[in-house]
Amino acid sequence: MILIDTPLWAAHGTVFAHLVSDTSYTELHDFAGRVGLPARAFDGDHYDVPAHRHAECLHAGAALTSSAEVVRRLNASGLRLRKRKGDRGILRVLSTRIGPGSRSDVDLVASDRPVDPALVFAAMTFIRDRQGAVAVTWSERRSEWSVPGGWREVDETPAEGAAREVAEETGIVVSPEALAPVGWERFRPVVGPSRFAPEVDLMQVYAVRLAETAPRLRSEPGVSRPPEWASPEEFALLAAREFWWPLAAYLLR
């Protein structure tokens, strides 16, 4: 069911309502497409609807309800993406395969603020060269193209772990201080064993821009496919089906 609350949230010189579905994101996106809401109005689990478009949504079939009921219905449906104020929700991916016999709901969020390091179990880094190409790496364990990343080691900060993974997987040396936070992912297991503690379930996402154009990349021992530089369009051909790709697409736009 499509629900909308009253426009009360002030921003950009107007007030906004929240348009949600308590059934599926597909239903929500289909409705938004029919009424002509732009993709940029989507914030992870809802569309922000300016006051002047509110009546149009009601006329198209959205049910008017309270803000509290919107939150309650989202929570009950499992479609709510929890994030900090000011962060941008990209997508909540439901029951995606994480490993053998394991599935998680994953929240993809863009943010230039780091998350609490105590909650971070891993990090990944988008490395771009002077021309905007992306350093992509092959994961033997997951059998997919991605960007450098991995689990933190004992006593590492998230940025230190990310810089280490970059060096190990590409041969590029960057200082932890050069890595800018650009987003995070939250993993909530729903099927099978969890590989991390419930209270330590965030992956910090970083980005760094190099001054050089396509510096030489070094392959990590034991990896069957060497790292390479790819344009964002080429990277999409390699990885667009992965659960994390919507966040990557947003960051590489």
Can you name each region flagged by the protein language model?
Residues 204-207, 216-246:
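NUDIX/MutT-family hydrolases
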Residues 128-168:
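Conserved Nudix-box catalytic region and its N-terminal flanking loop in Nudix hydrolases
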Residues 185-216:
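Active-site-adjacent beta-strand/loop module that shapes the phosphate/pyrophosphate-binding cleft
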Residues 17-45, 52-54, 60:
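Basic nucleic-acid-binding interfaces
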Residues 173-184:
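A short coil-to-beta-strand element that immediately follows conserved catalytic motifs
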Residues 71, 78-124:
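Acidic, metal-coordinating catalytic segment for phosphate/diphosphate chemistry
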Residues 44-81:
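Short, compact, well-ordered microdomains
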Residues 2-20:
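Short glycine-/aliphatic-rich beta-strand segments at the starts of folded cytosolic domains
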